């Protein structure tokens, strides 16, 4: 489950709580279960959008549990395979939060499809083995080409070099930069300098409550640094 109100599993399968994984990393964002508190709901949304972004921007095949795109929490039960009731069922009744989430997932999938550099079949080398001017995959912090942010900062940038693959048009893919900030404070990340006349464009910012994916790509005001708001993800294209 990716919904942000997990809690410990319950003994409801007659297996004395020995079924499933012993690892249950969870957070309720300050309130257990359903809530009308806007702050808690917004924090859960942020966590959910961060998790989904990591899934779709990773190189491997994205895997979703049924209902992840519909705010399905299984009422905090992470082991509901034996629950033929409301706990294990997916509620497809539409609501505002669900519609916004489904739109976000659709756009994540569409972006991934449009940019083959994210889903390369070959393993990443993390070096410039084809002499393209930068590694196929690189990590960045408050300094470009350096992944050494202190752990307490909770932020880092990832760049996929589009020159290593061609898109459906037979042309090199764009540069793809993802800035992750898991911290409760604002973080600034460095943007690598692009070759030639290429510029960085902001495509997505999950800190935006209405539309995480911008209606139109926006030229980054600062071509050297990007501000990532608390517990959010930004996506940029270099082209």
Locate the predicted segments by residue.
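Short, compositionally biased low-complexity segments
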Residues: 15-28, 74-86
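Metal- or metallocofactor-binding catalytic centers and their adjacent structured scaffolds
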Residues: 18-41, 98
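Carbohydrate-interacting/catalytic domains
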Residues: 9, 35, 41-45, 49, ...
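Single conserved hydrophobic/aromatic residue that forms the stacking wall/gate
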Residues: 1-10
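Short glycine-rich loop/turn motifs that provide flexible caps or phosphate-binding loops at active sites
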Residues: 3, 19, 29, 65-66
């Amino acid at each position: 489950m990716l919904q942000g109100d997990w809690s410990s599993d319950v003994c409801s399968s007659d297996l004395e709580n020995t079924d499933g994984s012993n690892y249950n990393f969870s957070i309720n964002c300050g309130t257990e279960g359903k809530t009308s508190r806007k702050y808690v709901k917004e924090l859960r949304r942020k966590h959910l959008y961060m998790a989904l972004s990591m899934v779709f921007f990773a190189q491997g095949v994205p895997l979703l549990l049924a209902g992840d795109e519909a705010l399905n929490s299984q009422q905090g039960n992470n082991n509901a395979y034996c629950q033929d009731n409301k706990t294990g069922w997916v509620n497809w009744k539409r609501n505002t939060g669900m519609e916004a989430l489904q739109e976000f997932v659709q756009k994540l999938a569409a972006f991934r499809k449009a940019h083959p550099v994210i889903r390369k079949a070959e393993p990443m080398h993390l070096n410039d083995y084809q002499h393209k001017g930068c590694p196929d995959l690189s990590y960045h912090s408050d300094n470009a080409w350096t992944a050494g942010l202190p752990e307490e900062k909770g932020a880092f940038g990832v760049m996929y070099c589009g020159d290593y693959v061609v898109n459906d048009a037979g042309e090199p893919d764009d540069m793809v930069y993802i800035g992750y900030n898991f911290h409760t404070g604002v973080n600034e990340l460095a943007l690598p300098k692009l070759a030639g006349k290429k510029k960085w464009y902001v495509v997505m910012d999950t800190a935006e409550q209405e539309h995480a994916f911008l209606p139109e790509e926006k030229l980054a005001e600062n071509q050297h640094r990007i501000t990532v708001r608390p517990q959010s993800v930004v996506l940029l294209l270099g082209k």
